[in-house]
């Protein structure tokens, strides 16, 4: 057995809720530069036509984007929006991941044998609910990641200022900008990510290919990350563009998608795919492995505290 030993008592809903948020924050700390590179690549060419985009591209590839940012803006630019990112994960992942098992059991009326339909429904529910709770933090995170320090003033100087400025200039609705594409994205992401992780893990365990420890969690998380990136990338690009757009630039998320298709072609929907995969794959591995270990560690601590002397 690698890592903490599984406890006899299943983790409580509170342990899952806190463990998911904490694990997601740890994963964000490690993979945030890849997420920032993804955002920069996704918004690149937004104001240009298809013909000019390739010729005038400032960022080329994951490594090229990171090196360009370090050279022109300094290493700290890779962590622009980290505070909002951690706020997002603590509120977002706690709901979409931490409540997944509870919602799944609700749909199956307490049965441990959940079908694919119940898993998909649970993933969609917690994904959409998480967006409703954490959308303002996502808007601020994307705005910070998108702004460049070089060649002009920054839109926001601090996280608190960003919340205040957006609310003042765009209204409270500005903090929930892009909710529709984000709900769609996270319903897709949550379904694909959690259900794929669930299914891969269950398959490996039932076939006795692996035991319920770190290698199994690593393999399941990596597979879930790849499947999620392939399916969710188009919606993710639209979400990023729309949330970062100036007031009135796009009438709706649908208008944003049509503008992208017309000006940049269908390949625009997979802009930033490699950093998305590197980020989501590595994020999934760190998050799920940490989450599984945190659940076991917290329950072991709880059991030792409750055990009689």
Curated annotation (Swiss-Prot):
Listed GO MF terms: antiporter activity; chloride transmembrane transporter activity; GDP binding; L-aspartate transmembrane transporter activity; malate transmembrane transporter activity; oxaloacetate transmembrane transporter activity; oxidative phosphorylation uncoupler activity; phosphate ion uniporter activity
Solcar repeats: 11-106, 114-203, 212-297
Region (Important for interaction with long-chain fatty acids): 16-63, 278-285
Topology within the bilayer: Multi-pass membrane protein
Record GO biological process: adaptive thermogenesis; C4-dicarboxylate transport; cellular response to amino acid starvation; cellular response to glucose stimulus; cellular response to hormone stimulus; cellular response to insulin stimulus; cellular response to lead ion; glutamine metabolic process
Keywords, comma-separated and alphabetical: Membrane, Mitochondrion, Mitochondrion inner membrane, Repeat, Transmembrane, Transmembrane helix, Transport
The keyword Membrane is assigned to this record: yes
GO cellular component, one term: mitochondrial membrane
Subunit note: Homotetramer. Adopts an asymmetrical dimer of dimers functional form. Interacts with MICU1 (when methylated); leading to decrease the calcium sensitivity of MICU1.
Comment field on protein domains: The GDP-binding domain is located within the hydrophilic cavity, with GDP phosphates likely forming salt bridges with the charged residues, Lys-141 and Arg-185.
Job description of the protein: Antiporter that exports dicarboxylate intermediates of the Krebs cycle in exchange for phosphate plus a proton across the inner membrane of mitochondria, a process driven by mitochondrial motive force with an overall impact on glycolysis, glutaminolysis and glutathione-dependent redox balance. Continuous export of oxaloacetate and related four-carbon dicarboxylates from mitochondrial matrix into the cytosol negatively regulates the oxidation of acetyl-CoA substrates via the Krebs cycle lowering the ATP/ADP ratio and reactive oxygen species (ROS) production.
The protein's name: Dicarboxylate carrier UCP2
Gene: Ucp2
């Amino acid at each position: 057995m690698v890592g903490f030993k599984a406890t006899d008592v299943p983790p409580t809903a509170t342990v899952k809720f806190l463990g998911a948020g904490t694990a997601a924050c740890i994963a964000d700390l490690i993979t945030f530069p890849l997420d920032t590179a993804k955002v920069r690549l996704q918004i690149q060419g937004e104001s240009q036509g298809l013909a000019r985009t390739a010729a005038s591209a400032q960022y080329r590839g994951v490594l090229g984007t990171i090196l360009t940012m370090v050279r022109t803006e300094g290493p700290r630019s890779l962590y622009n929006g980290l505070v909002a990112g951690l706020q997002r994960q603590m509120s977002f992942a706690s709901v979409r991941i931490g409540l997944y098992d509870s919602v799944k059991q609700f749909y199956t009326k307490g049965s441990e044998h959940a079908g694919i339909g119940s898993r998909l429904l649970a993933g969609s529910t917690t994904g959409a609910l998480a967006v409703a709770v954490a959308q303002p933090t996502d808007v601020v995170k994307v705005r910070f990641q998108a702004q460049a320090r070089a060649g002009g003033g920054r839109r926001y100087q601090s996280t608190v200022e960003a919340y205040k400025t957006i609310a003042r200039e765009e209204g409270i609705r500005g903090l929930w900008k892009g909710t529709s594409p984000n709900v769609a994205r996270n319903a897709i992401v949550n379904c694909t990510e959690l259900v794929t992780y669930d299914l891969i893990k269950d398959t490996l365990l039932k076939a006795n290919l692996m035991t319920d420890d770190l290698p199994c969690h690593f393999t399941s998380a990596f597979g879930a990350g790849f499947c999620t990136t392939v399916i969710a990338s188009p919606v993710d690009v639209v979400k990023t563009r729309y949330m970062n757009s100036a007031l009135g630039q796009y009438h709706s998320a649908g208008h944003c998608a049509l503008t992208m298709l017309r000006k940049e072609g269908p390949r625009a929907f997979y802009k930033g795919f490699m950093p998305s995969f590197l980020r989501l794959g590595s994020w999934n591995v760190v998050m799920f492995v940490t989450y599984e270990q945190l659940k076991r560690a917290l329950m072991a601590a709880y059991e030792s505290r409750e055990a009689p002397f």
